[in-house]
Amino acid sequence: RECRSESKKFVGLCVSDTNCASVCLTERFPGGKCDGYRRCFCTKDC
């Protein structure tokens, strides 16, 4: 199962999953993706 948490450090509109994921790495998440509302969500297995 995958858990999602909105990124605390990501600024601006999320248009690149890669950008989002690299910010999430600094928040101790293994990855991240943009959602439909252009926000960055960090993901991890839970």
From Swiss-Prot:
Q: Which family is this sequence assigned to?
A: Belongs to the DEFL family.
Q: Which UniProt keywords apply?
A: Antimicrobial, Disulfide bond, Fungicide, Plant defense
Q: What does this protein do?
A: Plant defense peptide.
Could you tell me what this protein is called? Defensin Tk-AMP-D5
| Domain of life where this protein originates | Eukaryota
Q: Which regions span the lipid bilayer? A: none
- Where along the sequence do coiled-coil regions lie? none
Q: List the disulfide bonds.
A: C3-C46, C14-C34, C20-C40, C24-C42
Q: Which organism is it from?
A: Triticum kiharae (Wheat)
Q: Which GO terms describe its biological process?
A: defense response to fungus; killing of cells of another organism
- Pfam families for this protein: Gamma-thionin
